[in-house]
Amino acid sequence: EGDVIATGINGFGRIG
């Protein structure tokens, strides 16, 4: 879950 802009270490991120 998340957006491409909010990618993290695992390639997933969250906006908020």
Curated annotation (Swiss-Prot):
GO terms, molecular function: glyceraldehyde-3-phosphate dehydrogenase (NAD+) (phosphorylating) activity
Species annotation: Chattonella marina var. antiqua
Predominant location category: cytoplasm
NAD recorded as keyword: yes
Record GO cellular component, one term: cytoplasm
Coiled coil, from the record: none
Signal sequence coordinates: none
Enzyme type, top EC level: oxidoreductase
Full protein name: Glyceraldehyde-3-phosphate dehydrogenase
